[in-house]
Every structure is written in C-alpha cells, then in structure tokens.
Swiss-Prot record:
Primary gene name: RPS0
Ranges annotated as biased composition (Acidic residues): 211-242
Species for this entry: Komagataella phaffii (strain GS115 / ATCC 20864) (Yeast)
Region entry Disordered, spans: 211-263
HAMAP family: Ribosomal_S2_euk
Function: Required for the assembly and/or stability of the 40S ribosomal subunit. Required for the processing of the 20S rRNA-precursor to mature 18S rRNA in a late step of the maturation of 40S ribosomal subunits.
Similarity annotation: Belongs to the universal ribosomal protein uS2 family.
Coiled-coil ranges per UniProt: none
A single GO BP: translation
Keyword tags: Acetylation, Cytoplasm, Ribonucleoprotein, Ribosomal protein
Protein name in the entry: Small ribosomal subunit protein uS2
Main location: cytoplasm
Compositional bias per record (Low complexity), positions renumbered to this chain: 246-263
Length: 263
C-alpha cells in the first residue's frame, strides 16, 4: 500500500518502533502473516517489516477517524499489558474501552448491563480477545487487531503486524494509533509538530512498582522538608558573643565610697 509523502514513516517513529521491539515477532508464523515478515533470524525469531506495520497503523487510523461518533469505537484488551493503553486511547480519542475480562454477551445480549453496539472494535490480541471477536462477527462489526506472526486472523478485517506480547510494543502501537487519529481529525493540525503526550503514558506499570515509586517520592519530600526546617532554625538562632574573662575590671575608687558612707 503506497502512502502520500506526508504519511511516510519518519526516522523518529522508526527509532521508537525498534526501541520498543515492535519488530520482534513470534517464532511460529501463520501463512497469512508471511507477507509481513522481513526475515527470520538464526534463532528462529521472525522479524516484522516495520514499514508494513506503519502502513496498517495509518489505514486503521483512517478507518477510526471516519466514524462520526467517537464513542462508537471500542478498544478491547484482556491482556494485562494492554489495559492501560486502551484506557488512554479511549481518553484521548473520546472512545470507549473494555479493559480486563470481556463479559460474554456485551455485543449480542441487550439484557446485560455492559451491552454495547459499537461500529468498530480494536483488540490487542486476537487470541486473548477471541470472545469479543466472535461476538463482533455475529453482529457484523468491523475488527482491527494487533496481530503477531502466530496470531489467528479469522474475522479480523485490518491486522496491524507487531509484537503484541511486550508491554512497550503494545503501548507504543496504541500511542501511535491515537496520535494518527488525532492528526486526521485535525486536533493535531501540524504533522511535523510533536505531540505533548509521551509514549510512556501508554506503557503498562506494575502496581508494586507504582507503590514503591510513591513511597520513595514521599520519603524524598519528607527529607527535603526536614532540610528546609534545619536551614530556617540555623538562620533564626545566632550564637552569642563569647565573654572575655581575661579582661581586668576597672579599679574601684575607695575614697568615693568612704565619702558616701559619711553622708
């Protein structure tokens, strides 16, 4: 698929894709995913062509931007590494997100509390999100999926070839997809201007790591306050001047004392 020059993959985005290991696919490869393989390493890992990954990101963004109501686009992720990413995607694009376990019947049973009628769904992994894909096929909902080389592509309309098992890879794909959607909608009018949101915001973070970081920041803040208090006390308290005990007292005038007693 040829893209206009303005949609070409930039050197900065290519570096991001390589740094996040988006190009490292699975060792097993489905027949329908062979066109996305750049080469196979001696250890059996299939290297994904990031040029084709970028083309599919642009195609998916154009489909998403064509939906009149952004809330009709639902991002789904049962995989833990993708739950934070889909929530951020829905927040930035004004869409909907299903993070965590997908409740069966969400797209087919209108009695359920979580019932939705989306016009498009995006899944993080066709294997872990198979229930959402299956129900979407029943009601003719188009499906965009992040697919690895060993991922099934049944009922998937647009496959974005990438490493859908790494937390950095998943987060970066959702980040680039969000940014491209905002560019097509005109929210980011200048394609050469950098987005103020960093890719790190889409990366999965371990809850224990978050708690540890918060504790370290709290300890650092307490230490800084204690240092400030010490400085204030030192400034307020001044050491008294030392007395000169070697200095001799002025001689007493005994004549004046005798005259005073006489009076």
């Amino acid at each position: 698929m040829s893209l206009p020059a303005s949609f070409d993959l930039t050197a900065e985005d290519a570096k991001l894709l390589l740094a996040a290991n988006v190009h490292l696919g699975a060792k097993n490869c489905q027949v329908h995913n062979e066109p996305y393989v750049y080469k196979t390493r001696p250890d059996g890992v299939n290297v994904i062509n990031i040029g084709k990954t970028w083309e599919k990101i642009v195609l998916a963004a154009r489909i998403i931007a064509a939906i009149p109501n952004p809330e009709d686009v639902v991002a789904v992720s049962s995989r833990t590494f993708g739950q934070r990413a889909v929530l951020k995607f829905a927040s930035h694009t004004n869409g909907s997100a299903i993070a965590g376990r997908f409740t069966p019947g969400s797209f087919t049973n209108y009695i359920t509390r979580e019932f939705k009628e989306p016009r498009l769904i995006i899944v993080t992994d066709p294997r872990t999100d198979s229930q959402a894909i299956k129900e979407s096929s029943y009601v003719n909902i188009p499906i965009i999926a992040l697919t690895d080389m060993d991922s099934p592509s049944e009922f998937v309309d647009v496959a974005i070839p990438c490493n859908n098992k790494g937390k950095h890879s998943i987060g970066l794909i959702w980040y680039l997809l969000s940014r491209e959607v905002l560019r097509l909608r005109g929210v980011l009018p200048n394609r050469t201007e950098a987005w103020s949101v960093m890719p790190d915001l889409y990366f999965y973070r371990d809850p224990e790591e978050i708690e540890q970081t918060a504790e370290e920041e709290a300890e650092a803040a307490e230490g800084a306050e204690f240092e400030v208090e010490e400085e204030e006390v030192e400034q307020e308290w001044q050491e008294p001047a030392e007395a000169d005990w070697n200095a001799s007292a002025p001689p007493a005038d005994w004549n004046d004392a005798a005259n005073a007693e006489a009076f």
